[in-house]
Amino acid sequence: MLGTRVTRAVYTRAPLKLQLRALGLHRRYVHNGSKNDEGSSTSTTTNKEENDKKLPDVYPQMLALPISRRPLFPGFYKAVVISEPRVMKAITDMVERQQPYIGAFMLKDSNNDTDIIHDISEVHELGVLAQVTSAFPSKDEKTGKETMTALLYPHKRIKIDQLIPPKDVKIEDIVVEKVVDNEVASEETKDEETVDKTESATDKVSEEITEEIAKAPSTEVTEDPDNYENPTDFLKDYNVTLVNVSNLEDEPFDIKSPIINALTSEILKVFKEISQLNSMFREQIATFSASIQSATTNIFEEPAKLADFAAAVSAGEEEELQEVLESLNIEQRLEKSLLVLKKELMNAELQNKISKDVETKIQKRQKEYYLMEQLKGIKRELGIDDGRDKLVDTYKKRVEKLNLPENVQKTFDEEITKLATLETSMSEFGVIRNYLDWLTSLPWGINSKEQYSIPRARKILDEDHYGMKDVKDRILEFIAVGKLLGKVDGKIICFVGPPGVGKTSIGKSISRALNRQFFRFSVGGMTDVAEIKGHRRTYIGALPGRIIQALKKCQTQNPLILIDEIDKIGHGGIHGDPSAALLEVLDPEQNNSFLDNYLDIPIDLSKVLFVCTANSLDTIPRPLLDRMEVIELTGYVAEDKIKIAEQYLVPSAKKTAGLQNATVSMDEEAINALMKYYCRESGVRNLKKHIEKIYRKAALEVVKKMSIEDTEPLVSTSEEPQLSQTNQNISSSSAEDSTTDLEDSVNPDTAKEASKPNNSQEGASVEETKKAVKTEEEEDTSMIVPEDIKVEITPEDLKKYVGPPIYTTDRLYETTPPGVIMGLAWTNMGGCSLYVESVLEQPLHNCKHANLERTGQLGDVMKESSRLAYSFSKMYLSKKFPENRFFEKAAIHLHCPEGATPKDGPSAGVTMATSFLSLALNKPVDPTVAMTGELTLTGKVLRIGGLREKVVAAKRSGAKTVIFPKDNLNDWEELPENVKEGMEPLAADWYDDIYKRLFSGVKKSEGNNVWKSEFELIDKKKKEND
């Protein structure tokens, strides 16, 4: 063989002669020990000693297998699962070649599940030499991947000297080593066979290796070439991790050492305690004891094996077990094993305690179940079964479908236990049963699916209501925020506006748009706090509050609850203040744990959308008002009312009157005349009543015409016969009294079914009700009106349908005399025109002294405003017209019409001052001018509220010019264009701005001499008297 050998530097472990000898020994060991590959799973000392004799002192390169989670200990079997195909093939080949030896090393990262070691830093350097006793294919249940399960028997501790990772060969990994051995003959061809061609990384490296070999001196081999073959060279073909290792022997120790004996005794003591708690440990200890006794009768002679056994059977931490494996000092190994074993004892004691507790609970439940079954049997035999068990089962089945919070579940368990032990004749039984009925009827954990479609919501809102831009925009904002967040929290919104503008009905539309259930209740006149918070359940007839009833009715935790007439809630009753109880309900920071007196458990109302309605904010308590987001709804102008009447009111009234198939029409001029002469209020409720009245009379007229012409009633040929008008009225009235169901409003088919009469009538059976409805359907079928019968409603026909006009003119005054001014006021009904009249009580020459009389049920604020306006007018007139002595003698009477209506507020200051000046100058003001504003003594015009309502009222009264404070100019700009259309604004900062607009045509001479004749007469009388 050639004297020079080229190989990897990491393969160089010993002189070539020593390596070849070791290989020969290893080959003989495999051959002799192959019969033990299928040995038992329990190690014995005899087998171990026999194997130790067969194991060589020096090993060739072997396969390195990483082990995760816990290391292997010599003498104790362990099964490992291998998923890497290369390693699986290599192990299969090793077993077939009778070379089943590997190095097993624990991974430092337990999460790194691999069968290949790429770097020595990935594993602990100290491991064990293990024998693959058996290997069989398996399958990963999770991934379905083919794997291999190998049973390993560790022999002794080893340490990695060099790691050969499965990488491509690099140039720096190749070296040329010259070995001169006189016992080896030189032969070029034999040396070339020793070169492993599969380890060359590139063609260039192979050429360099060949050139180096050719230059080497030749010697002649004297031994059989087969003896020099490395038995593990075949592993290089699988590209797996190989290692060169060295043996590690335990440090010498004194068997008679008291420390070692004490540690051994303590370990045996712990083993005894664990064996009493864990049967699995007991079996393992017995097996280990048998194996020790077969070799020696004294366990104290084998402390190293005892330490390894203690670590091998313990479920300790990875690092602790690895430290035991790495301890070559027997005393230290025993100490570390004892620590691990002590922890195992603690775990066993804890596990035993848990097991006993669980067993005790199971036995208790089993005993209770057994006794209850016996009790049921006894009751059945005695015939005293009271149905209580069925009731308990019913409640439990209900709860299974709900997602009860922990505190609610605890309360339910307590109450159901009480119910099961009480007699049905006891009064408390009925109380608990009613309580559980309510508790299990609430929608715990049930929410209706949120609707985030803005086009759909806009369509629904526009279908049901005209205008209301602020309300619709707020709801769309609410949906948009919910869409971005992925959830919708509850809100508290308050709609404030005059009656008839659609506050309640818009709540129903919002529930449809949001896909939420709808519940409405009114708090107008409510004086009992129990209506909100519920009664204590100890009272007879106790019930939860309206909020809990709403949740039960809607069966969702996120309904829309409309609290109607919140401004009319009672105060100061003997049963508490309901408005104070609403503070908790309508506070977003508190209603997530609302406590009802009846249920007495926290209820989450944070997902509920509360909508409140009110006509005025003045009567709502301030703390309650602060918790709500106020949206003001103003009255409608004429154009809005026409659109609402044409799109909503007329079709609805026509259908209600049964004229949907008849040729009955009401043109726009008739609607306009109806609003002008009959319905001038802000809302459309009165307009709806008049339109329904008109169509009812039209229906009577149609029937009369058909009777005159002797037209026989024709049965409708439609597939679905319609119910009588009486039944429709009954159905509609009952629907108004009850809460509207959202699903019925969304689904037309369901709504159609809901409009049918209720089959469960009071005092009649179901069969009788069905017969009665069937009879009514047969008798009262709808009629088809002939096409030649037509009714057209014109403005001239309104008197015939709804009587004489209530309002004959647009304004109270078509032409205003001096001292009469159109003011504007805000009321709970919306805006209205409020005239201010001032006249002289008698001619100036007959007045003894100047004074001011006020009538019209004026409040204190308006009285002060009139006094202020009177003083300001005297001052202003003296500055403008010094010779006008009107206020020296004038006895003025100021009146505001409709004296039965109380009036108050500061915004009539400019109107009163203008009335006084108009009277003083004897100059009438344009009757199409309306004004509002608070006045100071110096003539400053201050800001007022309710400008939108006042402008609407001014337009409704036929005003063309509106005078308002300059500070309200932004409010004017925010008004809709249809409201501002045809109106001329005048934003006054000082009263001079108003005077220039109204009295600009009054010359100085005219103003000074307007009362000249009267004062000449007064002066003449005065001289005569003197």
Swiss-Prot record:
This is Lon protease homolog, mitochondrial. ATP binds at residues 497-504. Keywords: ATP-binding, DNA-binding, Hydrolase, Mitochondrion, Nucleotide-binding, Protease, Serine protease, Transit peptide. Residues 714-737 have a biased composition (Polar residues). Its EC number is 3.4.21.53. Residues 62-345 form the Lon N-terminal domain. GO terms for biological process: cellular response to oxidative stress; chaperone-mediated protein complex assembly; mitochondrial protein quality control; mitochondrion organization; oxidation-dependent protein catabolic process; regulation of mitochondrial DNA metabolic process. Residues 195-206 have a biased composition (Basic and acidic residues). Belongs to the peptidase S16 family. Residues 185-194 have a biased composition (Acidic residues). GO terms for molecular function: ATP binding; ATP hydrolysis activity; ATP-dependent peptidase activity; sequence-specific DNA binding; serine-type endopeptidase activity; single-stranded DNA binding.
